[in-house]
Amino acid sequence: VRDPDTGEPARSPALYKEVTERIRDSKTDVIINLTAGMGGDVVFGPIEAPLPLLPTTDMVGASERMQHVIECRPEICTLDCGTMNFADDVMANTPSILRSMAKIANDCDVRIEIEAFDTGHLWFAKQLVKEGIIRDPVLIQLCMGIPWGAPDDLNTFMAMVNNIPNDWVFSAFSIGKNQ
């Protein structure tokens, strides 16, 4: 969702609740899928003085990152399955935070949609399934063309597809010209 005053992305549970209630009140038969990716943004200072982190850093714990999911109870929520450089910033998702977020989703009976931005994210997703943290059927979204994750060329796409277990349900998207 976006902050109506600034137009910037927001993780306010009240804004998510307003949107999900509007959708449900419309009686439209759709599956609601909310992001759980916000709250993991690390923005470093200048190259020669990266600390302290810049005020635009938005890094909070697993419970706060999942608060809108707890309150809104969508059918699905995303789980960004790893840390990566994201343009000039860092999207930080440690294994322990991801395990905690997945447990919260499971406790709320919300289906997890894994978001894999690179091949290492697939590797960790398989580990979460092996540990029983992510339930069948496993849903995974391949997120292509995000700077500096997996490029959106056919070879990289096929490498990722070929690493998805046959019993998982996958989809994919790209940003930019290959969208």
List each model region and its residues.
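Residue-level "edge-of-site" marker
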Residues: V1, M38, D118
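Histidine-centered divalent-metal-coordination microenvironment in nucleic-acid enzymes
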Residues: V1-D5, T35, A125
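Glycine-rich, proline-tolerant flexible connector loops at the mouths of alpha/beta enzymes
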Residues: V1-V19, F86, C143-M144
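Alpha-helix N-cap and loop-to-helix initiation/capping positions
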Residues: G7-L15, L53-T57, G61, D89-I97, ...
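Active-site glycine- and acidic-residue-rich loops that bind
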Residues: A10-P13, D41-M59, E113-L122, S171-N178
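Short, structured secondary-structure boundary patches
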Residues: S12-I23, I133-L139
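Active-site beta->alpha loop and helix N-cap motifs at the rims of alpha/beta catalytic domains
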Residues: E18-M91
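Catalytic alpha/beta core domains of metabolic enzymes, predominantly
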Residues: E75-Q179
